[in-house]
């Protein structure tokens, strides 16, 4: 069972919607470069990076211009070895897109792997499979719109095949797949903004042919998505950092610029406040670092150099931290495992579930898969999360004044607003 969606980390990054000439306010100032050591050190923790999941780390290192040849070589080899062992059908479209971005970044020799294994062509086929599934299953993709946006962005950057009509049809900002936890998903919207921006540029540059109405439609989608992101009070997850380039090019009033500059300053302060927790995860550090150095995924195909100021790093231990749980959406089916008087984290809770399963697999049976963000429950008591039905299992925790804390897992459904 494939992961139905990437669980967001709520509210850990703000970004600024300001014109291009003032974009540097979104970026960490040179005097604060020393604070990036924690993020870079987190990405050096190879024990937490397995196989293809190293693509995020490799991409981040290259976009940020971090000079660590031995780490790049190790990550590249791990990814290639993992892919050679895998059946391509076991890769989601988004995973393949991320691998292409990582290998294609900064025009390194790894680009040969993309060509030799026809990865862009295979991504095009996977994108078609996503569209086909949407046509059959009430507009639900095999994965999610976050990955679908990565697909379009990657196909656009690497001149792959995709249909403009599919883009204009399925990337309407009012599509239900842009919603998560009862709200518009700014993470997904931000990736879509970059994907649509790349497509718009390709049309303007004559790289792909499209009708004027299609170009106008895409521009309206971009503007609508940006408006929706602004309406969510600028609170976004780690992934949203890649929308910075497009959003920084918007024409806004002086009053708005001043307000956004203030928000940008809070961005870095808030980042440092949370750095002792979630940013110690390699995947989290990888997603935020390039933006803090002024880079985005739209820079992937450029030949990038090292930052103006070298970021010296120190080796320090990076402990494993549990994944944060998303907000409750709507509960379809609930399994209550136990009642306890003290608070325990999700890792301990899963250990309890494993022990219970050994005692009675009928009542407490469950399956899970490991991801860079932590364990992901795929089924409980034979009831599976289902992409086509937009359902997934999540950890729940409730406590009443007169009762001990109750912990469990529930099958929830992603809903449109």
UniProtKB/Swiss-Prot annotation:
Q: Would you list which residues are glycosylated?
A: 90, 161, 166, 179, 312, 328, 345, 360
Q: What is the lineage of its organism?
A: Eukaryota, Metazoa, Chordata, Craniata, Vertebrata
Q: Please provide one cellular component term from the Gene Ontology annotations of this protein.
A: extracellular space
The UniProt PTM text for this protein says:
Contains about 30% carbohydrates.
Q: In which tissues is it expressed?
A: Haptocorrins are a family of cobalamin-binding glycoproteins found in blood, salivary and mucosal secretions.
**Example GO molecular function term?**
cobalamin binding
Free-text function comment from the UniProt entry: Binds vitamin B12 with femtomolar affinity and protects it from the acidic environment of the stomach. Binds to cobalamin and to cobalamin analogs such as cobinamide.
Tell me which InterPro entries the record gives.
Cbl-bd_prot, Cobalamin_Transport, Transcobalamin-like_C
Q: Which UniProt keywords apply?
A: Cobalt, Cobalt transport, Disulfide bond, Glycoprotein, Ion transport, Secreted, Signal, Transport
| Region (Globular N-terminal alpha domain) location | 24-308
Does Disulfide bond appear among the keywords? yes
* Native organism: Sus scrofa (Pig)
Ranges for the region named Flexible linker are: 309-327
Entries under Pfam families matching the protein? Cobalamin_bind, DUF4430
Disulfide bond entries? 156-198
Q: Which residues bind cyanocob(III)alamin?
A: 143-147, 187, 287, 376-377, 393-395
Where are the stretches annotated Globular C-terminal beta domain? Answer: 328-417
Q: What is its main location?
A: secreted
Location comes to: Secreted
> Per UniProt, what is the name of the gene that codes for the protein in this document?
TCN1
Tell me if Transport is a UniProt keyword of this record.
yes
What GO terms in the biological process aspect are recorded for it?
cobalamin transport; cobalt ion transport
**Family assignment from sequence similarity:** Belongs to the eukaryotic cobalamin transport proteins family.
Q: Which Gene3D superfamilies does UniProt cross-reference here? A: 1.50.10.20, 2.170.130.30
Signal peptide coordinates: 1-25
The name this protein carries in UniProt is Transcobalamin-1
């Amino acid at each position: 069972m494939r992961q139905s969606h990437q669980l967001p980390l709520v509210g850990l990054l703000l970004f600024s919607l300001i014109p291009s000439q003032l974009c540097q306010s979104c970026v960490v100032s040179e005097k604060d470069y020393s604070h990036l050591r924690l993020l870079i050190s987190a990405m050096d923790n190879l024990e937490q990076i397995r196989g293809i999941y190293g693509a995020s780390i490799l991409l981040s290192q290259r976009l940020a211009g971090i000079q660590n040849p031995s780490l790049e070589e190790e990550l590249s080899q791990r990814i290639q070895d993992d892919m050679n062992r895998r059946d391509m059908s076991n890769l989601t479209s988004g995973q393949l897109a991320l691998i292409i971005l990582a290998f294609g970044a900064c025009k390194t020799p790894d680009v040969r792997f993309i060509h030799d294994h026809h990865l862009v062509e295979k991504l095009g086929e996977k994108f078609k499979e996503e569209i086909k599934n949407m046509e059959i299953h009430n507009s639900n993709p095999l994965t999610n719109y976050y990955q679908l946006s990565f697909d379009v962005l990657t196909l656009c950057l690497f001149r792959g095949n995709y249909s403009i009509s599919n883009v204009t049809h399925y990337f309407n900002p009012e599509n239900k797949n842009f919603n998560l936890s009862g709200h518009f998903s700014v993470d997904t919207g931000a990736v879509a903004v970059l994907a649509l921006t790349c497509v718009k540029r390709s049309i303007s540059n004559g790289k792909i042919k499209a009708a004027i109405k299609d170009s106008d439609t895409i521009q309206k989608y971009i503007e609508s998505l940006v408006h929706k992101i602004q309406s969510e009070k600028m609170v976004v997850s780690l992934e949203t950092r890649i929308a910075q380039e497009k959003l920084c090019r918007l024409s806004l009033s002086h009053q708005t610029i001043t307000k956004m500059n203030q928000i940008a300053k809070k961005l870095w302060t808030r980042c440092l406040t949370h750095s002792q927790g979630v940013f110690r995860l390699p995947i989290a550090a990888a997603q935020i670092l390039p933006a803090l150095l002024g880079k985005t995924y739209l820079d992937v195909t450029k030949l990038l150099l090292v930052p103006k100021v070298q970021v010296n790093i120190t080796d320090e231990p990076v402990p494993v931290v549990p994944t944060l749980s998303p907000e409750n959406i709507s509960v379809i089916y609930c399994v209550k495992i136990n009642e306890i008087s003290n608070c325990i984290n999700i890792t301990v809770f899963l250990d309890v579930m494993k022990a219970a399963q050994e005692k009675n697999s009928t009542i407490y049976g469950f399956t899970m898969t490991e991801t860079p963000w932590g364990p992901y429950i795929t089924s409980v008591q034979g009831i599976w999360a289902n992409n086509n039905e937009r359902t997934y299992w999540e950890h729940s925790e409730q406590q009443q004044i007169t009762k001990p804390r109750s912990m469990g897992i529930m099958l929830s459904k992603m809903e449109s607003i």
